[in-house]
């Protein structure tokens, strides 16, 4: 999808979980396909918003970020949480050159490894307060609490023409987050969905059943699944049960904002 008149685009840089696709040592059909065809691979969950000649990075799951982001400079970074598969790209990035890069995210005294102690060009900002909007490059950003094993935020992202909710990693949504997001007309909801339907609720990440519950709760115009594992990919190849406006995102997909 092309950018809108404001030149704002949302990029899925990675749509996999920490395991990624292909999973190490796995010989299932999905992982074999991904080994042969780069288009079927899923790198660690990561996204970016490009605004003309600059980037707002959402998480840093890719160990080597530069090839995916050139030639645009990273102006800001939003972190959902400090699990390694969402921040590993910051470790080489911090020793780069150029202006300091403001980094926003939830409160977490431990952070990840020594990022806080040795931030390099990363400029970690005071922790965000849920439901308090702020602005980056003319885009309104509001953090919302999620449900995960580590304190995690999703983000409501509002441009002059579109509204998007980015909601990973999570298992369901807290009632206050549902109430807040339901008050907005969402063009897009990007929702964690790591597993095919489960008989009992999974831990930390949605399955298809819980992701579709979020679809019903928030009623977005379009919902995109992300943080997808190889088992869900296998299920998606054999099922046609997703509602018309629910899609599995893939690495490289872009949405106009």
Predicted regions and their residues:
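Binuclear metal-dependent hydrolase catalytic cores
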Residues: 1-176, 188, 237-257
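Cap/insert and terminal regions of metallo-dependent hydrolase folds
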Residues: 172-256
